[in-house]
């Protein structure tokens, strides 16, 4: 509410079918809506566009109980001022999950967090009854003071203001010549419905070594898979396991540094402690509190330099594995069932007998009965479209992402910020530095909600 008692407006200047349209229906969209509602914003002018149930998205729309959150419950936060909210909800509403509790905290199933977000939405009638168009946006174009939005079902709608909350786009195969999806060529493994199509003795190649790869290994072990598993990744490294770190105080980053000073501050902070240690993670988490502001003070060239040289290492340190998945990987490594190959997959061909021939950059080849693509998110076709048609300018160093202001407004081709097009969540990570986890997206949602209701 405004101080004079008036409700804030979300409609902007344009007169179109929707005052505010949130494009995307995953966690980022849900977090923004929850924070808008918490600020008393009227919901009668808000529309959501997205194919999935609100709050599920790629991260939490799982059907596989082996796919778990990679952080303990109290770090999964939609309400920054009440960090234990999900943990308290889970303690009351989740029963019979004997695998959740570990020595360093409770790591619930990914789908449990989706259930929690759904319960938060149901508790707010204005959100539960929001218009939700179950489609995907494929193009956005200017229309007077607002926007026309084309959908993949052939229909269209409009809005005065747009927030792009498109999340992580589905993966593509990490080589030039794309191949068709089949039950044994799993391009998008995030939902977790593929293991039932894999024979227990199948030779499996897993592409990538991050959290999705560990999810795949964990569910295969749980299903008593006895075939060999080969993991192929350029760095040949698995992420470290989560520790029981506590009391990470926010550090103030130095002002006006270049890439070298940015990196030096990080190295000096974590010191020479092995990254497996609890103290190393505590220090690392201290860096993350204000990294977004520090990152935005770097010029684009320095941002690009750091991303090219150290982005992969930051991701490994940032996205540590939950104890359950990490334990499964270590078990299979110890028994020799899992092998890690430091290489890159360059292509896959399939014989008439259904065997997949996996080519590697070194010239080596692997034979597999199934290939699971855990190489990470692909490129967002909607973002690509609005960059190609000039609706938004390209980022200087990450050219497949939009240029954005520190207040999350997309920038026009002429260099001026849009006053009615914003972004939130993973699609902003290149400008915000580290906005991918639930807590950091929640903080971002809180700030954007405050600006939208002004």
Where would I find each of the regions flagged by the language model?
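Flavin (primarily FAD) cofactor-binding/catalytic cores of flavoenzymes
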Residues: 2, 6-53, 57-62, 99-257, ...
